[in-house]
């Protein structure tokens, strides 16, 4: 059995590793068009802060481990340029040798990830503009920061990525200015969570403008509908789109958000072709249908399952799905979410109740901070639909308790009965989750 995998970062390498683990004698070829092996892209903003720490420290595995230790034929700078689904062949260009060849397969895994949305306005193709997506982007941004010593940076887009970048730049004494086209930041979060992020932006003295159209970049000045801003460099992070050009050209069917349409086994519309990661749809358990939420853990889970399903083709396993759990850091705040959000519930016409509480994270005399817990739930039954949190100290791991509760379809009544650990260094005697659950019970 021979499997060819297009894309070797997250889902692709996970699929390759699982195939070799379960079927060591099978042939696995990974075609990765860039020069980097699988890496932790979510760590890129934090690497910026350390001039002497190479971006290669974000590699998940060394090339030697992948090739020798796992027995995977992992080819860097080999770009797949066409898929012939009928002949089960991939046309490849070796960018190092500049030669074209064809690679046959029994199974093909499409794991090409996503690509950044780009600005088409004049000036946003110059060298002082970074679309922060890959390790090469990180290398270039570090070079601009440490060699050009910029005093100001314009961040276009106010999502997770640029909020993390703003945090890092601020602490490097580079003045960030954030502009966002939408009316506000973080539209997937409830207003009660967004307001705490906006308070932190104001507290740090960071200039922020929403509802802004970017018009042009002229040298070190960016013109917008809100005026002109000095920008020694610009970081653009305005969302991503699934990288599906090659798949679509082969006649493959696309689905939600233009991602590769997959079934619950992660099979595509083309024969013997699976898809995983940021290029593919993701089954959302609570909605009972596919959605699109490109995150590293999801890509790795899908890749692992694809590898297993290829080996066990007669007894495949369904992808369990996602509950849209995510978290990010912004200065001393952790912002986290799981389950359905208000926008999704309103679009579905669903009735729901909402509560939020503010609570200390642990015993006051042990330090700690404060956190806000927000719950979305069904009146009467108390079924937990979604949860969001923001605050200092232990936030993300508490959010994981709520992610587990949503996975198990727990109610706020059951949540209030959980036997959570207590000691002053870790929690107040009434954990914030229990306080929130008890308030929800009063409304349910």
Residue ranges and their predicted role:
Residues 1-73, 160, 166-189:
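Beta1-alpha1 glycine-rich phosphate/pyrophosphate-binding loop at the start
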Residues 6, 103-113, 156, 229-239, ...:
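Short hydrophobic core segments
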Residues 6-10, 14, 18-25, 33-34, ...:
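Flexible, glycine-rich terminal cap/loop adjacent to redox cofactors
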Residues 25-27, 69-96, 103, 171-262:
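A Rossmann-like FAD-binding core segment of flavoenzymes
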Residues 59, 152-154, 160-215, 295-298, ...:
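Rossmann-like dinucleotide-binding cores of NAD(P)H-dependent redox enzymes
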Residues 110-172, 207, 262-264:
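Glycine-rich dinucleotide-binding loop and its adjacent helix/turn
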Residues 125-147, 221-223, 228-308, 401, ...:
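FAD-site-proximal beta/loop scaffold in flavoenzymes
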Residues 262, 276-340, 426-443:
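A conserved FAD-binding loop/helix module that cradles the flavin
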């Amino acid at each position: 059995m021979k499997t060819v995998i297009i894309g070797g970062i997250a889902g692709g390498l996970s699929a390759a590793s699982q195939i070799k683990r379960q079927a060591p004698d099978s042939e696995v070829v990974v075609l990765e068009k860039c020069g980097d092996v699988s890496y932790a892209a979510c760590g890129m903003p934090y690497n910026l802060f350390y001039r002497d720490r190479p971006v290669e420290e974000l590699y998940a595995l060394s090339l030697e481990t992948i090739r020798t230790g796992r027995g995977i034929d992992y080819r860097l700078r080999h770009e797949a340029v066409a898929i012939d689904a009928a002949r089960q062949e991939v046309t490849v260009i070796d960018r190092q040798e500049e030669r074209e060849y064809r690679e046959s397969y029994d199974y093909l895994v499409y794991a090409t990830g996503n690509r950044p949305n780009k600005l088409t306005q004049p000036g946003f193709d110059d060298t002082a503009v970074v679309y922060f997506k890959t390790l090469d982007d990180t290398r270039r941004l570090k070079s601009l920061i440490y060699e050009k010593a910029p005093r100001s940076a314009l961040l276009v887009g106010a999502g997770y990525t640029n909020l993390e970048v703003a945090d890092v730049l601020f602490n490097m004494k580079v003045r960030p200015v954030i502009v966002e086209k939408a009316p506000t930041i973080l539209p997937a979060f409830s207003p009660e969570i967004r307001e705490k992020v906006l308070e932190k932006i104001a507290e740090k003295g960071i200039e922020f403008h929403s509802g802004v159209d970017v018009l042009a970049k002229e040298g070190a000045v960016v013109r917008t509908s809100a005026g002109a801003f000095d920008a020694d460099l610009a970081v653009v992070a305005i969302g991503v789109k699934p990288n599906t050009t090659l798949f679509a050209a082969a006649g493959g069917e696309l689905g939600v958000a233009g991602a590769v349409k997959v079934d619950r086994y992660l099979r595509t519309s083309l024969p013997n072709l699976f898809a995983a990661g940021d290029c593919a749809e993701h089954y959302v358990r609570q909605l009972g249908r596919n959605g699109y939420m490109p995150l590293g853990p999801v890509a790795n889970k899908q890749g692992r399952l694809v590898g297993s399903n290829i080996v066990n083709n007669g007894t495949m396993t369904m992808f369990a799905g996602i509950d849209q759990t995510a978290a990010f850091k912004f200065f001393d705040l952790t912002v986290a979410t799981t389950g359905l959000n208000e926008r999704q519930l309103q679009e579905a016409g669903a009735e729901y109740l909402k509560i939020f509480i503010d609570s200390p994270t642990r015993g006051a005399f042990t330090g700690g901070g404060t956190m806000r817990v927000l719950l979305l739930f069904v009146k009467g039954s108390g079924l937990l639909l979604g949860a969001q949190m923001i605050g200092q100290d232990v936030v993300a791991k508490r959010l994981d308790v709520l992610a587990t509760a949503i996975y198990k379809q727990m109610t706020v009544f059951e949540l209030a009965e959980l036997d959570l650990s207590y000691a002053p260094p870790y929690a107040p005697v009434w954990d914030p989750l229990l306080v929130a659950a008890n308030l929800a019970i009063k409304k349910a």
